[in-house]
């Protein structure tokens, strides 16, 4: 069993490396194509690459849609997307406060097929191993600082990725006036202003936490709105009336900011870092990554 998992992991990493290499090559060819169309000089590293320019003329027959498909290197969800519903476990750090436990309950209600697990004395490798054996697709771990939720980690099984978000301005359901009852039907999802490749990667991670398929009778809406790399999460219910549509917020309400994306699972500290927020760079606060 362990040998098979190790072999599958090696095969997956090799396939992922090949796809990333092809994606980088395709991006370089796209830069050459744009430079030729606009009459701009090529960057020095591309101008000196003779093999890249030699093969460029054979790429002119590629359609834009095919080029876009070549850049889609994220196949972690391909095996189960739209075929089976996600199975999610929500847990916390050790010895959680009352407020963090309450927030974990509300996050559990946010996802239709989620189960909340008391952390107890579980160490992370044993917890991940138990999730894999039980057929869990995603693990959500919440952390806090002095009773205030500070981070949310999403790890997909069996091979990753693992996305870590910082939490800001957390408002729980019981802090919202007239929040109403929590609906547990499959929600409609709204993803707003995710324009970059990294943004679409984050959308792929978040949307696969929910069930696929039509939701005609659902009156529940969850919104993920990107504003300056801060993802605002809001949950509403709506009711159709004679005068139109009335909406009400049911919570919880918080902002997330991505600060690290790894290719492996949560217990794998040696996994490759796909993206990491580097605040010490001068342009870190001026550039939008999502």
From Swiss-Prot:
Annotated compartments: Nucleus, Nucleolus
InterPro entries named in the record: Brix, IMP4/RPF1
Top-level lineage group: Eukaryota
Keywords noted in UniProt: Nucleus, Ribonucleoprotein, Ribosome biogenesis, rRNA processing
Boundaries of every Brix domain copy: 86-267
SMART domains: Brix
PROSITE patterns assigned: BRIX (PS50833)
GO biological process, one term: ribosomal small subunit biogenesis
Coiled coil: none
Primary localization: nucleus
Disulfide bond entries: none
Any one Gene Ontology molecular-function term assigned to this protein's record: RNA folding chaperone
Gene3D superfamilies: Probable brix-domain ribosomal biogenesis protein (3.40.50.10480)
One GO CC annotation: small-subunit processome
Assembly with partners or alone: Component of a heterotrimeric complex containing IMP3, IMP4 and MPP10. Interacts with MPP10. Component of the ribosomal small subunit (SSU) processome composed of at least 40 protein subunits and snoRNA U3.
PANTHER family registered for this protein in UniProt: U3 SMALL NUCLEOLAR RIBONUCLEOPROTEIN PROTEIN IMP4
Function: Required for the early cleavages at sites A0, A1 and A2 during 18S ribosomal pre-RNA processing.
Name of the protein in question: U3 small nucleolar ribonucleoprotein protein IMP4
Species annotation: Saccharomyces cerevisiae (strain ATCC 204508 / S288c) (Baker's yeast)
Source taxonomy: Eukaryota, Fungi, Dikarya, Ascomycota, Saccharomycotina
Gene responsible for this protein: IMP4
